[in-house]
């Protein structure tokens, strides 16, 4: 009796496994979950290190991120039919030399965390994500196009008034070689939050790209800062 029960259990397990495999194969054409990441550690030797009174010291160290910050993330895409799909992204950045999050003890665990919809009408995303002025600069005229997210030198962040923003709604659409995007982020009356209104236009064709962007940033204190960027490559 025990043998028969064992055989029945095995058969049921095999059927469940087969049906699970069939479901996975059927769903791969309409949805995907992708785990991605990069780990970057660099050795740095610096001379003339130290205060002005004694700057002849040398320093040897490991740094978490030479070309790019170490990071891992999850991308999700789900086909909703009618040419529309749902999107999800979560991304964490960390120092590979120590394993600690780059955001520190008080910063956000995920540097990106957003959901969205994409279809023939464009792409709409909501959450913590890249500032679209940063999108424009890094995709159009980055200082180092082979690695625009380079960890050592990032003038693009200054151009864009920061790489990311919280509580953001972002819309992007393309018509031929022209891409346009709009962004609005809520301050939510937070003492540390800020409100942004941003837009850009970008043209790219035949190996050439040019873009114009504008951002209005309002601090929690009420002070406002404006940024314009224009460039091409």
Predicted regions and their residues:
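Short strand-loop junctions, especially beta-strand C-caps/beta-turns
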Residues: 183-187, 215-217
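Detector for outer-membrane/organellar transmembrane beta-barrel domains
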Residues: 197-233
């Amino acid at each position: 009796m025990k043998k028969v029960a064992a055989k029945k259990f095995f058969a049921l397990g095999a059927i469940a496994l087969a049906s699970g495999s069939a479901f996975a194969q059927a769903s791969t054409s309409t949805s995907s979950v992708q785990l991605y990441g990069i780990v970057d550690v660099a050795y740095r030797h610096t001379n003339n290190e130290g205060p002005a009174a004694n700057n002849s010291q040398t320093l040897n160290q490991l740094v978490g991120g030479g070309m790019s910050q170490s990071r891992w993330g999850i991308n999700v895409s789900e086909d909703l039919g009618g040419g529309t799909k749902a999107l999800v992204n979560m991304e964490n950045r960390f120092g590979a030399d120590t394993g600690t999050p780059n955001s520190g003890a008080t910063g956000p665990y995920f540097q990106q965390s957003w959901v969205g919809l994409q279809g023939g009408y464009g792409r709409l995303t909501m959450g913590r994500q890249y500032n679209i002025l940063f999108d424009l600069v890094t995709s159009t005229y980055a200082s180092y196009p082979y690695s625009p997210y380079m960890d050592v030198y990032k003038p693009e962040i200054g151009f864009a008034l920061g790489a990311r923003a919280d509580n953001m709604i972002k819309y992007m659409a393309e018509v031929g070689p022209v891409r346009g995007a709009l962004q609005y982020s809520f301050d939510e009356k937070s003492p540390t939050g800020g409100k942004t209104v941003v837009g850009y236009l970008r043209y790219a064709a035949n190996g050439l790209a040019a873009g114009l962007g504008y951002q209005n940033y309002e601090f929690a204190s009420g002070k406002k800062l404006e940024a314009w960027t224009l460039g091409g490559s």
